Amino acid sequence: MNKFWNFIEQNDERELFLEGAISDETWWGDEITPAAFKADLASGKGNITVWINSPGGDVFAASEIYTALKEYPGKVTVKISALAASAASIVAMAGSEVLMSPVAYMVIHNPSTIAIGDSEEMRRAIATLDEVKEGIINAYEAKTGLLRDEISDMMNRESCLNAKKAVELGFADSILYNDGENDDTASPVLFSRQSVMNSILEKLPPKPDTPGWVNIQDRLTWLSHYKTKNQSGGK
């Protein structure tokens, strides 16, 4: 199993590094990967610093990490070293304090998927994406206090925020290494969904010979089946 996270223990302080794409390669194919992450998180005590440099990836894997970090009993400090884009920005919202390097960026946009089928299946895919978007907005709203419509509009525009703008809007709390002498931090750069996707594809390992997920609806169907199986005690 290829982990996209790494824990480092230092006395009473812990550091978690999330680097590269948040891959769903084994996350949804079985229950092993989320259990492994939770076990790693629970294996130590004390406050934890989460370093993020990620172009994003799977929204459901990011949601699992977000929830696990919110449940963690110690203080969770998020530090964005370079990029928290797409699904990685969801993870960043789990921090009780979010700090960004002056040259770091946060990118938020609408969720996307690939759907194949007739018009009814297309409508179901659209409805599912709308619901997933509402879930993402929940995390942004809880952190920033911004109006949902305002957040939704930012996602529609696919917004790239430099450190200063992220602090101004409430997505981050402060800027690292800022001595107050120069408020002109990083200038914004342009990101597109395609550039984020290309970055993800470059970092992902070769796809194993295991069944993949076609779209978000497939994942939700699998989750429903998995929960039903567990509740009935089936194999």
PLM ranges: what are they?
Residues 1-79, 83-87, 95-235:
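N-terminal organellar transit peptides
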